[in-house]
């Protein structure tokens, strides 16, 4: 019985130890979200971009640029899209004061519908006001002319 208990405890510890999948920058970024001494400021070049008109079946990338206008490192700690037709990527390393970062939204019109579209990307940062930012892109999808 003691051997079974000991084996179970070792197995449980092994599984929980393997669950730590956060990188060092994620750990630092997440702790910066809660530590007011690490708050900084961000300025977005654009928070609304109209990409114009594309054909159904086309894919595009919309780029949102930000600048760290504070005096502490800026962390984009979470970026998520409003739907499955948009896949976001972003600067995952610390953005030092005065430097620029990027959020890119890759949009696949095959996963959407013809007509006007309005898509959003949500960004969480280590800034005191407006910790969550909403980046929006709009445009029109048309059926290609045969």
What are these regions (language model features)?
Residues 108-114:
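Short, surface-exposed loop/turn segments at beta-strand-coil junctions that are enriched for proline
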Residues 14-17:
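C-terminal motif of bacterial Sec signal peptides marking the signal peptidase cleavage site
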Residues 1-4:
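Positively charged n-region of N-terminal signal peptides that target proteins for export
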Residues 56-63, 114-120:
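Short, solvent-exposed loop/turn segments enriched in Ser/Thr/Gly
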Residues 19-54, 128-146:
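Long, low-complexity ectodomains and other extracytoplasmic segments of secretory-pathway proteins
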Residues 49, 99-105:
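Short strand-edge motifs at loop-to-beta-strand transitions and within beta-strands
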Residues 66-70:
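Asparagine-centered strand-capping/turn motif at beta-strand->loop junctions
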Residues 71-99:
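Surface-exposed binding patches on compact interaction domains or structured appendages
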């Amino acid at each position: 019985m003691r051997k079974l208990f000991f084996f179970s405890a070792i197995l449980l510890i092994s599984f929980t130890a393997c669950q730590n999948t956060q990188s060092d920058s994620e750990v630092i970024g997440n702790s910066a979200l809660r530590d007011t001494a690490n708050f900084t400021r961000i300025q977005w070049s654009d928070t609304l971009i109209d990409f114009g008109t594309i054909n159904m079946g086309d894919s595009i990338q919309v780029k949102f640029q930000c600048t760290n206008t504070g005096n502490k490192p800026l962390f984009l700690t979470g970026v998520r899209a409003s739907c499955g037709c948009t896949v976001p990527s972003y600067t995952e390393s610390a953005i030092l004061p005065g430097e620029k970062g990027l959020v890119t939204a890759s949009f696949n019109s095959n996963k959407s519908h013809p007509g006007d579209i309005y898509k959003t990307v949500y960004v969480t940062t280590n800034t005191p006001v407006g910790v969550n930012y909403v980046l929006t892109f709009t445009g029109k999808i048309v059926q290609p002319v045969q």
